[in-house]
């Protein structure tokens, strides 16, 4: 049998078995292991290890894509020194994602431009890296999608999709006042996720001003009652983080 036939068949089998890293690395790694005197078990271990590492990397990539982040940002790139009032240790503790497993919530409060979205994106990325499903949206976009889904009689399916995320990030609550129907739909979604999934909300408004966005004191009170039952508050106050970053880039 030609030496090419086993190689062709092996490539075919590895493709069927969905082992692309095996296919890409087995010859190069075999030569390396031969040089180092590694036995067949060690060779297979290294090959399987590379396949697992690559498979985990692809899974993380798929979760990041499914999350629909507007941009991928990590906490490693966040300049905590620019927002000294932000509790860095609290943020790093949240990055361990144990609060998500406990189905708790996080609310990040602070003026516009102080880095709330960056922190939310960083925590979302950390969750993706730990194997958790994440969804990212703005409050205005979420409400718009729910109203459209309601009009097209697919609201229940959309709500189930939102409820299925281990972590749902709702950015920019408070930037745009919601209609009565929109506020009610948001409340309904928060209620569905209550103690079933973790939710992270960022807002430029303190709690006592949420009525300006939600319209009804009764609805605001009921929503806060659910969202703050098991909650971690991040107070992100200070000068504009975006402005500080812009100045730093120009200075550099």
Segments predicted by a language model, with ranges:
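Intrinsically disordered, low-complexity and often Lys/Arg-enriched segments
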Residues: 1-12, 247-252
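Solvent-exposed alpha-helical segments within well-ordered globular domains of core cellular machineries
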Residues: 8-15, 24-27, 42-46, 62, ...
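Interdomain "pre-motor" coupling segment immediately N-terminal to P-loop NTPase/helicase cores
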Residues: 11, 15, 20-71
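AAA+ P-loop ATPase motor domain of ring mechanoenzymes
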Residues: 45-98, 240, 244-251
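Conserved P-loop
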Residues: 86-164, 211-213
């Amino acid at each position: 049998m030609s030496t090419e036939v086993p190689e062709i068949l092996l490539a075919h089998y590895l493709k069927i078995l969905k082992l692309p890293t095996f296919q890409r690395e087995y010859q190069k790694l075999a030569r390396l292991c031969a040089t180092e005197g590694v036995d067949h078990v060690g060779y297979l271990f290294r090959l399987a290890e590379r396949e697992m590492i690559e498979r985990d990397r692809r899974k993380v990539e798929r979760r990041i894509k499914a999350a629909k982040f507007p941009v991928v940002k990590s906490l490693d790139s966040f300049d905590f020194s620019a927002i000294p009032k932000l509790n860095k240790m609290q943020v790093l503790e949240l990055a361990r994602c144990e609060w998500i497993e406990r189905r708790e919530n996080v609310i990040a409060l602070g003026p516009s431009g102080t880095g709330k979205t960056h922190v939310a994106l960083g925590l979302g990325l950390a969750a993706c890296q730990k194997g958790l499903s994440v969804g990212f949206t703005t409050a205005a976009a979420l409400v718009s999608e729910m109203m459209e889904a309601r009009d097209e009689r697919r609201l229940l399916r959309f709500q189930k999709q939102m409820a299925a995320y281990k972590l749902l990030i709702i950015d920019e609550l408070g930037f745009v006042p919601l209609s009565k129907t929109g506020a009610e739909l948001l409340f309904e979604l928060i209620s569905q996720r209550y103690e079933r999934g973790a939710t992270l909300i960022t807002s430029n408004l303190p709690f006592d001003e949420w009525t300006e966005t939600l319209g009804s004191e009764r609805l605001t009170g009921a929503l806060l009652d659910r969202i703050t039952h098991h909650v971690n508050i991040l107070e992100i106050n200070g000068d504009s983080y975006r402005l500080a970053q812009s100045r730093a880039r120009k200075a550099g």
